[in-house]
Amino acid sequence: MATRVQPSVKVLGASFSQEANPFTAAVELTPMPMLITNPRLPDNPIIFANEAFQNLTGYEADEIIGKNCRFLQGPGTDPKHVEIIHSALEAEQSVEIDILNYKKSGEPFWNRLHISPVKTENGELHHFVSSQLDVTLELGKLVELEKERETLSIEKQRSSDQLQYIVEVANVGFWTRDYTTGEISCSAEYRRIFGLTPDEPVNYDKIIDMVVLEDRITLIQRSQESFATGKSFRVEYRITNRLGQVRWVETRAKALLGKSPALLGIVIDVTERKKAEADKALVTREISHRFKNSMAMVQSIANQTLRNATDPQTANELFSERLRALSQAHDMLLREDWTGTTISQICETALAPFNSTFGHRIRTSGPELVVSDRVTVSLSLGLYELATNAVKYGALSNENGTVQFSWDVLERQGERKFHMRWVEDGGPAVERPTRRGFGQRLLYSVLTGELRAKCDINFAPDGLVIDVLAPMTADVFPQLDSLSDTQAEPV
C-alpha cells in the first residue's frame, strides 16, 4: 500500500473556468481518471469528473458532480486510510494512498489515489485535483505473493519442526566451530553427549580436552585435512565427558571455506553400538572356543570308545549313547545361556536314561550349587558313565543294589571345600579292574584337571566308593560370592 503526503507546488490563476481554461481541457482529455473538488464550498464537493473517471466507476456525471469523494467508499474501506486522506486535506498537503473503493455495480477495486491542492498566487487554497488508478490486479498479485510467502514460511517452519523432531528422535547433535575463534555453537543433544550445561559456553579447547588421548591426534588431523581440502570426514573416538562418563562418539563434518571459515558437523553417541559390537565379537570368540572344546570332547569319546570296543556294533552303540549324553549336557547349558548349571540339574539330565528303570535305586542329594559350563559337560558325561558301569558291573546289575550320589560344602581351616561322593551298595562283589575305563578316565580328567580335586576311588567288596574333595574357586563355581555361610558344614 503506497501512502505519500507532501506540500503542494501547484499554482492556478484566480479565475477558473471549465470552458476556457486549458488546464481543464487537458484534464478532460487525459485517459487517467481525474476529479476536481472545491474546498471553498461546504463538504468539498466534486465540481469536475472526466470521462475516464466515469468509465472507471460506472457513474454518470450527474451522479458524481456535487458529491463528496466519500461516496466511493464502502464496507471494506479501511477507516485508517480515510483518516490519512482527511488529515492531508486539512493540512492542504498532497497525499498518495491505495484505498479500497467501490464502483456503481458494487464491485470493489483498489484505487491508487493521488490528491494535490491547487493554490492561487497568494497561496490561498483554490481547488483539489485528484487522479485515480485501478491497481486491483497489481495488489492482487502482491496479495497472492504475500500468501505464497506466508505459505512458504509455514512450510519452512513445518519442515524445520519436522527436522527438529527427526534430530531429537535420531539423537543427533549439531555443531558449528568457528575456525578463527574456536567458539562452538551446538544443539542440546551435543551438550548432552559431552555433559555440558544448557548455557555453558563451548569452545574447541574444552571439547578436545575431553577426547581420549589415543584418539585425539586422529581427530585433530582429520579436522585439519578438511580445512585444507574442503572435503568431509567421518571419525569415531572416545571421550570422557564432563560427567565422568566414557562414551564412544561418531563425528561427521565438513569445512566451510571462505571469509569466515568454519567446521560444520553432526555428532552421534555410538556407545551402545560399540558395546554391541564388542559383545558380538566376544560371543563369536566364545562360540569358536566352545566348538573347539566340543569337537575335542567328541574326538576323545570316539578314540576311547573305538580303542576299547570289542566289535564295530558295540563301538557304534557306545559312541551313540555317549554322544546323546554329550548332546543332553549341551542342551542343558543352552537353557541356562551357557552360564553354568546346578549339580541337581546335571544329575537329572545325566541320569535320566536310568530313572525309568532304576529311579528308586539311584538317590541324589546336595545343596543348590552352580558349576561352570566346562565342568557341566564333563561331570554330565562322568555321571552317565558311572551309572552305565553300575548297570553293567556294579550295584544296578542285580535287583537289590543302590547308588547314592551326594555333594556338599565343607568348612576346613577357614576355607570352603567342595565334597562329592559316589557310593554303590548291595551289588555283586567288586574287584579292582585291570585297566581304567572311559568313565573312570573322564572322571579323573574332571576331578584332577578342572576341579583340581583330590580323588579317592575305593573298590570295596560291598561296592564302589568315590570320595572327592576340591577347593571352591570362582572359575568352577560362578556363584561362589553369593553362597551363604549356612551352606558350609564345618568339619
UniProtKB/Swiss-Prot annotation:
Keyword vocabulary terms for this entry: ATP-binding, Chromophore, Flavoprotein, FMN, Kinase, Nucleotide-binding, Phosphoprotein, Photoreceptor protein, Receptor, Repeat, Sensory transduction, Transferase, Virulence
Region (HWE histidine kinase domain), start-end ranges: 286-368
Span of domain PAC: 93-147
SUPFAM superfamilies (alphabetical): PYP-like sensor domain (PAS domain) (SSF55785)
Enzyme class: transferase
InterPro entries xrefs: HATPase_C_sf, PAC, PAS, PAS-assoc_C, PAS-like_dom_sf, PAS_fold_3, Sig_transdc_His_kinase_HWE
Residues with the S-4a-FMN cysteine modification: 69
Example GO molecular function: photoreceptor activity
Physiological role: Photosensitive kinase that is involved in increased bacterial virulence upon exposure to light.
Family matches, as PANTHER family: HISTIDINE KINASE, TWO-COMPONENT SYSTEM SENSOR PROTEIN
Name under which the protein is recorded: Blue-light-activated histidine kinase
Organism, as annotated: Brucella anthropi (strain ATCC 49188 / DSM 6882 / CCUG 24695 / JCM 21032 / LMG 3331 / NBRC 15819 / NCTC 12168 / Alc 37)
